């Protein structure tokens, strides 16, 4: 009951409003506010009132302008960067090493036999076209060639370039002769790959400025088609094993061997080996700078067994990266040359970004709308993994198969000429698509916490001419138990990886403008220009609420009056009285209220006394204008 009473009082208070007019509210505010200026508007003479009114408006506008600048600066989410450099005990980076040749030619040769023969025929056709006709009928497997052939483009006539096929008749109705091709080769025709759709209705040409580039890219594309049809375990067995590649290992003062490395299969480089990856064991620390406290390796790359057309670079591909991160060694790695000792001084850059809304980065990639196809390796998120997963996803959706160089989701197949004849055309279009790259870049985010390794590299010949004899003897005996030298300078690589004197550099972001900075500047501007405080803002908010309150009450009253006017307009005359309404219910004959005048009646028949009712009218609550509880509450309020 008491709650209902208080609610009714509150409702009546809302209906009555503040009890002031607009003018009274303004006068009250100017007289009672703690802000300088408004008081002078109502206390001074007419001229000073006008002056203080203009000054108050001017300074209020300045305050609002300054507030807008500070709020816009705060919402720009700017950051400040702090840099710290020093030396401390840190985890040694994970080191990934790969051979430049992904496979041993002696083990993969049977898979590449047809492709190698075709490659040799192409070289003969390019280098000695007048001699290649004698071998034109040689037994070649043209099924590979027909999917993606190499062509010569004669652009001596830029308005009508000619496309010359290396094998068979020329296209576009062109005549074919060895002489014309010889002249074309002598003058340097461009070589290109012709990529066509399944029904050959759409064909594109991928041009190259050098025949070396064209032949290398064409061979890799065809080899990709072959490797995609071979189980990965067989490819692992055809690559370089760790016990043959890693001849010697030393970390600090502790010896190590190939068993301390984790093996993964990387499509570009075959078997790769990772030291100190931290997947199953704790990361190894390093507390001192210099080569004596780093990692030392002697590697045998077996250059004599390289695939001739697949690996044109000899050496070791290596990369330093963080523990539990996937090594994208093709994009971020470096080469170490055979026959040299390569020393690498390491400086660790730790980047710590603020995250949303200051920078579009992610902590673990959970909010990135791209399925991570590298999740099977149980590695941390990286933007490289996201970009490649995004490309593979587009490849599967557009070409119905995945590229051999990237991991596959479950249930999908790698692209090959047998199952997907037009995959090369689709892959080329997707690879050159700017829209696809922009889409993936827009969806993938950088990691908020990133570690980069800056390397200072120096090289020297190793071993020297004076010591190579005994060094190769010892290494050959350890590897093959042979008294003869089975190693050579062109197959040996020595690596030294260590921390520099200053081994870390931390680059950390922090908010340039926080909420404390914003409130301080807002209050400072308000206090400087108008002498106000937070309480002054509360007073101003109160007067705004009262203004809105009065306006709402006036609008409600106006709506009621308009409704009443519409109701009155629906009647022809004045509204009926209560007596007329009662008479309408009892006078079923609709007789007139006054009897007809007789000659004996007086001049004023309406003055005739009406009959007195025998019983008083019923005491209906509906005849009251207000409920009893409202009347009682009003009376109690007046008494209070």
From Swiss-Prot:
Region (Disordered), start-end ranges: 590-640
Phosphoserine PTM sites in chain numbering: 633, 635
Gene3D superfamilies, sorted: Acid-sensing ion channels like domains (2.60.470.10), YojJ-like (1.10.287.770)
PROSITE patterns for the chain: ASC
Segments of skewed composition (Acidic residues): 631-640
Extracellular compartment segments: 72-532
Presence of keyword Transmembrane: yes
Post-translational modification comment from the UniProt entry: Ubiquitinated. Can be ubiquitinated at multiple sites and undergo monoubiquitination and polyubiquitination. Ubiquitination by NEDD4 or NEDD4L inhibits the ENaC channel through endocytosis, intracellular retention and degradation of its individual subunits. However, some studies could not confirm the ubiquitination of this subunit of the ENaC. Phosphorylated on serine and threonine residues. Aldosterone and insulin increase the basal level of phosphorylation.
Catalysis: reaction(s): Na(+)(in) = Na(+)(out)
Biological process terms in GO annotation: aldosterone metabolic process; artery smooth muscle contraction; cellular response to acidic pH; cellular response to aldosterone; cellular response to vasopressin; epithelial fluid transport; erythrocyte homeostasis; gene expression
Compartment list: Apical cell membrane; Cytoplasmic vesicle membrane
Record's GO cellular component terms: apical plasma membrane; cytoplasmic vesicle membrane; external side of plasma membrane; extracellular exosome; plasma membrane; sodium channel complex
Domain of life: Eukaryota
Record bears the keyword Endoplasmic reticulum: no
Record function comment: This is one of the three pore-forming subunits of the heterotrimeric epithelial sodium channel (ENaC), a critical regulator of sodium balance and fluid homeostasis. ENaC operates in epithelial tissues, where it mediates the electrodiffusion of sodium ions from extracellular fluid through the apical membrane of cells, with water following osmotically. It plays a key role in maintaining sodium homeostasis through electrogenic sodium reabsorption in the kidneys. Additionally, ENaC is essential for airway surface liquid homeostasis, which is crucial for proper mucus clearance.
Record NCBIfam families: ENaC (TIGR00859)
This protein's name: Epithelial sodium channel subunit beta
Gene that produces this protein: SCNN1B
């Amino acid at each position: 009951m008491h709650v209902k009473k208080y609610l009714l009082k509150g409702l009546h208070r809302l209906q009555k409003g503040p009890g002031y007019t607009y003018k009274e509210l303004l006068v009250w505010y100017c007289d009672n506010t703690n802000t300088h200026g408004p008081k002078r508007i109502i206390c001074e003479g007419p001229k000073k009132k006008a002056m203080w009114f203009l000054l108050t408006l001017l300074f209020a506008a300045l305050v609002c302008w300054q507030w807008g600048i500070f709020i816009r600066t705060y919402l720009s989410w700017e950051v400040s960067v702090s840099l710290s450099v020093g030396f401390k005990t840190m985890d040694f980076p994970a080191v990934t090493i790969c051979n430049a040749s992904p496979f041993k030619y002696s083990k993969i040769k049977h898979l590449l036999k047809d492709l190698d023969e075709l490659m040799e025929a192409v070289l003969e056709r390019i280098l000695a076209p007048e001699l290649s006709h004698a071998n034109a009928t040689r037994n070649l497997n043209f099924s590979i060639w027909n999917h993606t052939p190499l062509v010569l483009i004669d652009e001596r006539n830029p308005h009508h370039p000619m496309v010359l096929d290396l094998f068979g008749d020329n296209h576009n109705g062109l005549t074919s002769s060895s002489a014309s091709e010889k002249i074309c080769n002598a003058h340097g025709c461009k070589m290109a790959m012709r990529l066509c759709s399944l029904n050959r209705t759409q064909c594109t040409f991928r041009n190259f400025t050098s025949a070396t580039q064209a032949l290398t890219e064409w061979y890799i594309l065809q080899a990709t088609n072959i490797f995609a049809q071979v189980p990965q375990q067989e490819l692992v067995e055809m690559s370089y094993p760790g016990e043959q590649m890693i001849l010697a290992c030393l970390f600090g003062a502790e010896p190590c061997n190939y068993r301390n490395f984790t093996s993964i299969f990387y499509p570009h480089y075959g078997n790769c080996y990772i030291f100190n990856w931290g997947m199953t064991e704790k990361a190894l620390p390093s507390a001192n700078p210099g080569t004596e406290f780093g990692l030392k390796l002697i590697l045998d790359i077996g250059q004599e067994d390289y695939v001739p057309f697949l690996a044109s670079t000899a050496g070791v591909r290596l990369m330093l990266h963080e523990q539990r991160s996937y090594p994208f060694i093709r994009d971020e790695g470096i080469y170490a040359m055979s026959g040299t000792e390569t020393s690498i001084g390491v400086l660790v850059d730790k980047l710590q970004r603020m995250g949303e809304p200051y920078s579009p980065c992610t902590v673990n990639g959970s909010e990135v709308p791209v399925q991570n196809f590298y999740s099977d390796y149980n590695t941390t998120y990286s933007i490289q993994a996201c970009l490649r997963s995004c490309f593979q996803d587009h490849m599967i959706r557009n070409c119905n198969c995945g590229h051999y160089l990237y991991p596959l989701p479950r249930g999908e197949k790698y692209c090959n000429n047998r199952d997907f004849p037009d995959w090369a055309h689709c892959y080329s279009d997707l690879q050159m698509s700017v829209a696809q790259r922009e889409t993936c870049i827009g969806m993938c985010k950088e990691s908020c916490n990133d570690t980069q390794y800056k390397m200072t590299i120096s090289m020297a010949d190793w071993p020297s001419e004076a010591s190579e004899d005994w060094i190769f003897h010892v290494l050959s005996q350890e590897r093959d138990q042979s008294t003869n030298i089975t190693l050579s300078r062109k197959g040996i690589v020595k690596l030294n990886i260590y921390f520099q004197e200053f081994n870390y550099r931390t680059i950390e972001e922090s908010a340039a403008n926080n909420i404390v900075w914003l409130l301080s500047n807002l209050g400072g501007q308000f206090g400087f220009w108008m002498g106000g405080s937070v309480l002054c803002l509360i007073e101003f908010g109160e007067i705004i609420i009262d203004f809105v309150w009065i306006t709402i009450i006036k609008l409600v009253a106006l709506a009621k009056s308009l409704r009443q006017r519409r109701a009155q307009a629906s009647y022809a005359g004045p509204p009926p009285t209560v007596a007329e309404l009662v008479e309408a219910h009892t006078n079923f004959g609709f007789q007139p209220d006054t009897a007809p005048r007789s000659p004996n009646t007086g001049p004023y028949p309406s003055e005739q006394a009406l009959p007195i009712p025998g019983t008083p009218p019923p005491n209906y609550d509906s005849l009251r204008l207000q409920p009893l509880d409202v009347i009682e509450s009003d009376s109690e309020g007046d008494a209070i």
